[in-house]
């Protein structure tokens, strides 16, 4: 959704992914939008690989105007059963991955006189919580703090930093979570999620992409350090309340 939105608006893209399948996605965008795209196979948890990815982007396009930090993982497990390896996996991808991306791009942004960073946090951790998601909630809440600190630190140097706080979208990660939750009928798990959303559906990836495109554009030029919730209203209802249907 994010790469599609940026391609639609004419951005030149550096698509970084751990999977070689990213090239297939890139080729579809090239054909549909005539987009200029390079792909880089890299692990966001590896600082050197992210430095190299940013360098390749600058070598190709001359500068980096926007960085979308949207790599993320979620593994479900009761807290007492979650091992340190799983905890560290969340930290490596969800926190260090964003940290490494920011470390890789900010020097270029400073040199060129500014830029935008959009970080994918979540409503989970900072606003709401679910059993079995301790590692995910911890790491996603940390990104809100990182967003605010970077926004303050770089505001006077024309680098804006904002984060999206997504509820549930129909993404591969959510589909994997649904499969873990209900291996026999993952679609039922997704339907159960939608029931709790006032809009009665999950977000479409392109809807999330449009928010990222807005936050990376001059249309949001006075926004920095902001947390933008995109959840179909799922965090609004009270758990216990008296009211009308």
Where are these regions (language model features)?
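Alpha-helical segment proximal to the catalytic Tyr-Lys
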Residues: 107, 152-156, 221
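C-terminal helical subdomain
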Residues: 163, 185-219, 223, 230-232
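Active-site loop-to-helix junction immediately N-terminal to the catalytic Tyr of the SDR YXXXK motif
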Residues: 82, 128-137, 149, 177
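Active-site helix of classical SDR
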Residues: 102, 139, 147
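Canonical Rossmann dinucleotide-binding motif of NAD(H)/NADP(H)-dependent dehydrogenases/reductases
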Residues: 1-14
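Short C-terminal tail/terminal secondary-structure segment
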Residues: 224-245
């Amino acid at each position: 959704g994010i790469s599609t939105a940026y391609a639609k608006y004419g951005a030149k893209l550096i698509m970084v992914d751990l999977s070689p399948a990213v090239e297939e996605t890139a080729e579809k965008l090239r054909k549909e939008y005539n987009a200029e795209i390079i792909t880089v196979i890299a692990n966001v948890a590896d600082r050197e690989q992210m430095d190299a990815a940013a360098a390749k982007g600058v070598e190709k396009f001359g500068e980096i105007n926007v960085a979308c930090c949207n790599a993320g993982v979620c593994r479900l497990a009761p807290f007492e059963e979650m091992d340190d390896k799983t905890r560290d996996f969340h930290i490596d991808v969800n926190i260090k991955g964003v940290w490494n991306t920011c470390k890789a791009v900010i020097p270029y942004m400073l040199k060129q006189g500014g830029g935008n960073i959009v970080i994918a946090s979540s409503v989970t951790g900072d606003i709401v919580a679910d059993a079995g998601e301790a590692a995910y909630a911890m790491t996603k809440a940390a990104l809100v703090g990182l967003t605010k600190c970077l926004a303050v630190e770089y505001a006077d140097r024309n680098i804006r930093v904002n984060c999206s706080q997504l509820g549930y979208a129909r993404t591969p990660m959510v589909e994997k979570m649904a499969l873990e939750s209900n291996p026999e009928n993952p679609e039922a798990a997704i339907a159960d999620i939608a029931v709790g959303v006032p809009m009665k559906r999950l977000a479409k990836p392109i809807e999330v992409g449009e928010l990222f495109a807005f936050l990376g554009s001059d249309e949001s030029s006075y926004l920095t350090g902001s947390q933008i919730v995109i959840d179909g209203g799922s965090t609004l209802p009270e758990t216990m309340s008296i009211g009308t249907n």
